[in-house]
Amino acid sequence: MTVFKRVVALSVLALAIVPFVSAGTVASKTNTSSSKTSESCSKSEFYFKEKDCCLPSGGPTPSSTHTPTPTPPSGKSCPPNGWYWNDEKTCCLPKWPTSTPTPTPSSAHHTSTHTSPSSTPTSTPPPQCSNGWDWISSLLCCTPSSPSKPSSTPKPSATPNKGNGHHYKRAHVARAVPACPKGLDACPIAGSSLGDYECLDTSAELESCGGCASVGEGQDCTAIEGAWNVGCDRGSCKVYSCFAGFKLSSDGTSCIAL
């Protein structure tokens, strides 16, 4: 009888220990899996820690079904260079890693008055949104700058001068140019059927650097592939830093894929 009691006691003790051993094993496996999250991405992907996911290097490839690229909802937009909207994540996602942008070499002889973000390598500069938009890190997208104000863009008069039609067209153009303050260019607004235009300083305007982009002049600095932080210096685009996976060109005007 005594032997029987001892056997029963040992059996109960063994059953009590098993759950703890199993729990420890599961916990160990979970921790190991979590620590390898960034290593689970394929060679054609990179890890984006802000959303804890793998993203395709260079952005999503065009769908074989020709599905249109998702566009941000009203009130949101993505930086024009290196970012795209993702409906599933409801935010903007980068086309390349964002954690280690390549800074401008200290030997570069830029004459720009802009302060290069690479002067503080410990902090990564935020993505550059289009004019009138600000980057919100918590939302991973651009939102309208506040306070939001109606556009004060001057518009040419719709009332024709007396005389024939040819005279009106010449006068119409003549009035449009002087309407902008000295030093600004009157750039037609793309898609406008009313002849509207905006006054831009094309010597420093990122999206119309060196000329009005709406008429095919100048350069859109925000469209430089691989560029993280750019500027427009006296009508010429300057690249200050690049996304990870790119290096700055020797002349500081583009980013070269590694």
Curated annotation (Swiss-Prot):
Signal sequence segment: 1-23
InterPro entries in alphabetical order: CPL1-like (IPR048661), PriA/CPL1_fungi (IPR038955)
Ranges of compositional bias, category Low complexity: 102-122, 145-156
Any single Pfam family the record assigns to this protein: CPL1-like
Annotated disulfide bonds: none
Region (Disordered) residue spans: 102-128, 145-166
Keyword Transport included in the entry's annotation: no
Keyword terms, alphabetized: Signal
Function: May play a role during the beginning of fruiting.
PANTHER family: APPLE DOMAIN-CONTAINING PROTEIN, PROTEIN, PUTATIVE-RELATED
This protein's name: Protein priA
